[in-house]
């Protein structure tokens, strides 16, 4: 397949949004050159051409190369439609939660390997709320990122594909940096890709 088809096919198989944005226009009005930008997963590229279509083609070549270099094309899989639907809805409310949160630091959260979301001690979180979606999606990302083994709970278990699907979708929605601290905590910095909102969370990891 050509690079454009490769990138679009990969995005569809992973349930990830793929958007090309015109961020500028250079040159005289009679001969403009369009500046097109695309942020996809952890990749960000910008190309300029007199044709928007050709600029997008150039970006797809770069993204296709990124996917190959990172071994993602070989590992690409098709997630269940229900997983992708959940990821899309949760991702939307994840970004909304960040935008509405006044504090830039949220602490502490605990990561317990038989729970379904990050939580505070003795804290009740309403199922289906934006708070729940935020914590659950972030938990799936951390589980996938850190390679944490999850135990079964109340006759329920996490599907590895489900966790991977939500994790991949989240990285297409926001930028996340995770650092292991000497004390055992995870320092998580979340940056929304479409604005200047930045949040830092200190998360206590416990088995």
UniProtKB/Swiss-Prot annotation:
A single GO molecular function term of this UniProt record: RNA binding
Q: Which residue numbers delimit the DRBM domain?
A: 2-69
Q: Mind telling me which InterPro entries this protein's record contains?
A: dsRBD_dom, Seadorna_dsRNA-bnd
- Has keyword RNA-binding? yes
Is RNA-binding tagged as a keyword? yes
Name the Pfam families on file. Answer: dsrm
- What does the organism's lineage look like at the top? Viruses, Riboviria, Orthornavirae, Duplornaviricota, Resentoviricetes
Output this protein's name: Non-structural protein 5
The entry's keywords: RNA-binding
What domain of life does the native source organism fall in? Answer: Viruses
């Amino acid at each position: 397949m050509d690079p454009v088809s490769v990138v679009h096919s990969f995005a569809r198989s992973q349930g990830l949004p793929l958007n090309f944005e015109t961020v500028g226009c250079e040159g005289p009005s009679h001969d403009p050159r369009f500046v097109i930008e695309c942020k996809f997963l952890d990749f960000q590229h910008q190309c300029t051409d007199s044709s928007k279509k050709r600029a997008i083609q150039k970006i797809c070549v770069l993204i296709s190369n990124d996917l190959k270099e990172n071994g993602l094309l070989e590992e690409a899989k098709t997630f269940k439609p229900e997983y992708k639907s959940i990821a899309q809805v949760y991702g939307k409310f994840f970004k909304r939660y960040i935008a509405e949160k006044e504090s830039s630091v949220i602490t502490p959260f605990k990561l317990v390997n038989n729970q379904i979301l990050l939580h505070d001690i003795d804290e009740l979180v309403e199922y289906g709320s934006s708070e729940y979606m935020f914590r659950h999606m972030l938990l799936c990302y951390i589980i996938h990122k850190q390679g944490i083994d999850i135990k079964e709970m109340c006759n329920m278990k996490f599907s590895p594909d489900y966790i991977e699907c939500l994790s991949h979708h989240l990285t297409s929605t926001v930028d996340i940096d995770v650092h292991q601290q000497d004390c055992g905590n995870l320092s998580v910095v979340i940056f929304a890709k479409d604005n200047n909102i930045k949040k830092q969370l200190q998360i206590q990891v416990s088995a």
